[in-house]
Amino acid sequence: MATFGAQTLGMDTTTSSSTGTFHLDIDPRPLFAAATDTATGVIAAVRADQLANPTPCTEYEVRELLRHLVGVMPRVAAMGRGDDPMRVTAPEVDGMADDDVIPAWRAAVEEAKAAWADGSALERTIVLPWATDTGAAALLGYVSEITVHTWDIAHATGQTPTWNEEAVGNAYGLIREWLPGVGRAEIFAEVRKKMGPAAAGAPDAFAEVAPVPDDAPIIDRLVAWNGRQP
């Protein structure tokens, strides 16, 4: 059972990830590895003249979104170690030199993978301001975030990466269970209360669902559920 904001959402889906659903007993670590591998390829292909490009994640330009991804990884590692991810001091990314982003990203990904090496972390209860769930579901939630931001960067820089269908499909299935299609403003108001001063002035993490056909590619359905128009 997962909780999101004031809502309680049952998670009992066990059908194919190609349809945008996920398995409760899936090990998300290979999916995390696949998502970060895709991200690494996209990040490495960004040119210097593209760093100021706007992205579909409207509060970030490409440069800022790259730094944001680096800053997310210590939270992923903290969850794997059993620490409170909201109390992690993220690396200083605001002024990170452009040439330092790729090595910092790669090092942070390896640290996160190592933190989840013990499979017992998948069964641990993880409490976040926006959800309470198993470690497996929480890690899969970050597969969703990493994939969506990878798409943001790819879209902003004219890249067409090959997506891992299993990773994207399971991430889409989870986020549909975690995040309702309506009432998001109210949900994030509750999340901000839980986050306290750290959330002051922050934009909604998810815009309203964008319309896409039911048979759209799974990556399009994932980003549309996260408020992007493919």
Report the location of each language-model feature.
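Glycine-rich loop at the start of a catalytic domain that most often binds anionic cofactors/ligands
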Residues: 68-69
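Arg/Lys-rich, alpha-helical DNA-contact motif
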Residues: 73
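Extended, alpha-helix-rich binding/interface surfaces that flank or overlap catalytic cores
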Residues: 65
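Structured surface interface patches that mediate subunit assembly and partner/cofactor docking
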Residues: 2-31, 35-38, 45-58, 78-90, ...
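Helical hydrophobic small-molecule/effector-binding pocket
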Residues: 111-123
